[in-house]
Amino acid sequence: MGLETEKADVQLFMDDDSYSHHSGLEYADPEKFADSGQDRDPHRLNSHLKLGFEDVIAEPVTTHSFDKVWICSHALFEISKYVMYKFLTVFLAIPLAFIAGILFATLSCLHIWILMPFVKTCLMVLPSVQTIWKSVTDVFIAPLCTSIGRSFSSVSLQLSQD
């Protein structure tokens, strides 16, 4: 607990004179914040979650709201997204991390101590099972299929047009 040291990656500049028909949102330079701490998503698992206001809300050229409405909506969207994410992570991150840790530990234990020994045992036993299965197939199934094949080979079919 202490002072918040993270920097925001979005800045809103609300100058009334510079707004025309665009949103006026100027994103901060990504290189500026690249070395501001550790990369929390080094494998880019959640790169699809980088949504901006324009990805969610879009007004076609023919139907524009007032510039002030657009600016306020944009600001409220960004602020509410930021605040709600922080609020939810305060209450959910630690319990969900604990549950995920228990789940992954359980699955790892089951995989290491139950599943892999079972698979290795099956792979050791399979050559002898394969030999027995081949013998059963040669003794019972092959003669049956051969006799059925010979029976059907003597059947002839002739079509005539009347």
Swiss-Prot record:
It is found in: Nucleus; Cytoplasm; Golgi apparatus membrane; Cell membrane. One of its GO terms (biological process) is positive regulation of dopamine receptor signaling pathway. Its main location: nucleus. Residues 87-107 dip into the membrane without crossing it. Phosphorylated on serine and tyrosine residues. CAV1 promotes phosphorylation on Ser-23 which then targets the complex to the plasma membrane, lipid rafts and caveolae. Phosphorylation on Ser-36 appears to modulate mitosis in endothelial cells. Phosphorylation on both Tyr-19 and Tyr-27 is required for insulin-induced 'Ser-727' phosphorylation of STAT3 and its activation. Phosphorylation on Tyr-19 is required for insulin-induced phosphorylation of MAPK1 and DNA binding of STAT3. Tyrosine phosphorylation is induced by both EGF and insulin (By. similarity). InterPro entries: Caveolin (IPR001612), Caveolin_CS (IPR018361). The modification Phosphoserine is found at S20, S23, S36. Keywords: Cell membrane, Cytoplasm, Golgi apparatus, Membrane, Nucleus, Phosphoprotein. It is a peripheral membrane protein. It comes from the Eukaryota. One of its GO terms (cellular component) is plasma membrane raft. The keyword Iron does not apply. Residues 1-86, 108-162 are cytoplasmic. PROSITE patterns: CAVEOLIN. May act as a scaffolding protein within caveolar membranes. Interacts directly with G-protein alpha subunits and can functionally regulate their activity. Acts as an accessory protein in conjunction with CAV1 in targeting to lipid rafts and driving caveolae formation. The Ser-36 phosphorylated form has a role in modulating mitosis in endothelial cells. Positive regulator of cellular mitogenesis of the MAPK signaling pathway. Required for the insulin-stimulated nuclear translocation and activation of MAPK1 and STAT3, and the subsequent regulation of cell cycle progression. Monomer or homodimer. Interacts with CAV1; the interaction forms a stable heterooligomeric complex that is required for targeting to lipid rafts and for caveolae formation. Tyrosine phosphorylated forms do not form heterooligomers with the Tyr-19-phosphorylated form existing as a monomer or dimer, and the Tyr-27-form as a monomer only. Interacts (tyrosine phosphorylated form) with the SH2 domain-containing proteins, RASA1, NCK1 and SRC. Interacts (tyrosine phosphorylated form) with INSR, the interaction (Tyr-27-phosphorylated form) is increased on insulin stimulation. This is Caveolin-2. The gene is CAV2.
